[in-house]
Amino acid sequence: MTRYQDDFYDAINGEWQKTAEIPADKSQTGGFIDLDEEIEELMLTTTDKWLAGQDVPEDAILANFVKYHRLVRDFDKREADGITPVLPLLKEFQELETFADFTAKLAEFELAGKPNFLPFGVSPDFMDARTNVLWASAPSTILPDTTYYAEDHPQREELLTLWKETSANLLKAYDFSDTEIEDLLEKRLKLDRRVAAVVLSNEESSEYAKLYHPYSYEDFKKFAPALPLDDFFQVVLGQVPDKVIVDEERFWQAADQFYNEEAWPLLKATLILSVVNLSTSYLTEEIRVLSG
């Protein structure tokens, strides 16, 4: 028998390890995996009981969970409805004519969880974890990292072509015409190139100590004068912040490339594609598969 001081892990797990097997559909096994599976099984059996009307708790949140789960599991209705449920949301974004139309709805979109291309978040301050602060980040790129956008990257064109083909097939399922698809994708790619030129690479993002750039709110607003940030934060946060921590400083220093009337057609196309991508897991099986 292995002594604890010789091999602590083997002393504890040695006997179990002799007979333990990794399931064919799993990449690992162990006590935490067993616990995870038990919790999953409990969730499934409990949800099935609630769906059958048994022992449903008198809790408004859980009652809504049951209603929502019933909708999600009604695959026949999802197939019959097709893209109909998402059409009002698509129409809302398609009818935004100008950048001013868009900025007038920024707070509304934020509170409703709709796309608005504003990468803000509230999380603990690096310098004082007891305090939550406003962080200003950046949108993500289509490709996995900014390094993929280098002209000599071997996978650049291959991956962008694959993205374009996949996106085109998906948009066809949403009844966009070929002309509309080409226009949307061209504009989306153009905005993506702008983003890729200024956001941090994965390597840069891993250097956490270098991500802390505190700005007074008044100084931060100067990065994007076209955005009604006072009104936005007053509605979303209930107050105007006194400072902003910027981890994506290059993006915000170039914010004029993204938040203005000139960039609006590119931004609008990006928002429409965001609506499509957000809805794929809630509609038909064909759309779910097309989305990858």
Predicted feature locations:
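Active-site-surrounding "flap" and adjacent substrate/cofactor-binding loops of secreted or lumenal enzymes
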Residues: T2-D7, A11-K77
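Noncatalytic, helix-rich "gating/capping" subdomain that lines the substrate-entry/channel surface
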Residues: D48-G292
